[in-house]
Regions:
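Active-site microenvironments that recognize anionic phosphate/pyrophosphate groups
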Residues: 1-182
Length: 182
């Protein structure tokens, strides 16, 4: 019965099959590169999602951001099952309440992936992990795949900016706005 399967389980089964067939190595890095590629096949193109976001935004900015946040989760860009592992608590201090977070959702590289990254051809594309070029990027051993990533273009004071949610969600609906130019 596949009706009640969670996305994590579906992807795990597909990844295990890919490993058993020798399509990918069995490491977090290679599994993440491959499942991101799979999820991209199920997503509409960026322009279609941007158009839908704008249509919703014209009616209700709140509904547009809800739509985009849910899409970021449903596309596995925000990996809910990893974010659940994060530790969060508050501490009273002389300066007020401090939020403490321990991010366990960002995958650690295994020794084989670290060695492979050292030997990998260096690339300056994308320029950084927070730029427009990441949208749809296939990734490599030393740069995460972003094929399932969709960025919403926005304008601030006449400038072009990108709006996205953080894949690691330090806080609820943690978003990032970055300049369209480096």
């Amino acid at each position: 019965d596949t009706e009640n399967l969670e996305l994590e389980d579906i992807l795990k089964n597909l990844l295990d099959e890919a490993v058993s067939r020798g399509l990918i190595e069995d490491s977090v890095v290679y599994r993440d590169l491959f499942d991101t590629k799979l999820m991209n096949c199920l997503l509409p193109r960026p322009a279609q999602i941007q158009r839908e976001f704008k249509e919703k935004y014209d009616i209700s900015p709140e509904e547009a951001t809800k739509y985009y946040y849910k899409l970021s989760q449903d596309s596995d860009y925000i990996r809910r099952y990893r974010v659940k592992k994060d530790m969060k608590w508050t501490v009273d201090s002389p300066y007020g309440v401090i939020d403490i977070t321990v991010n366990l959702s960002k995958p650690e590289k295994d020794p084989k992936a670290i060695a492979a990254a050292k030997n990998a051809k260096q690339s300056s594309y994308p320029k950084c992990q927070l730029c427009m070029e990441n949208e749809g990027y296939a990734g490599r051993i030393n740069h995460p795949a972003r094929q399932n990533h969709r960025i919403m273009p926005i304008e601030i004071n006449g400038g072009k900016w990108g709006f996205q949610y953080s894949p690691y969600v330090y806080y609820n609906e943690h978003c990032i706005v970055f300049n369209g130019q480096h």
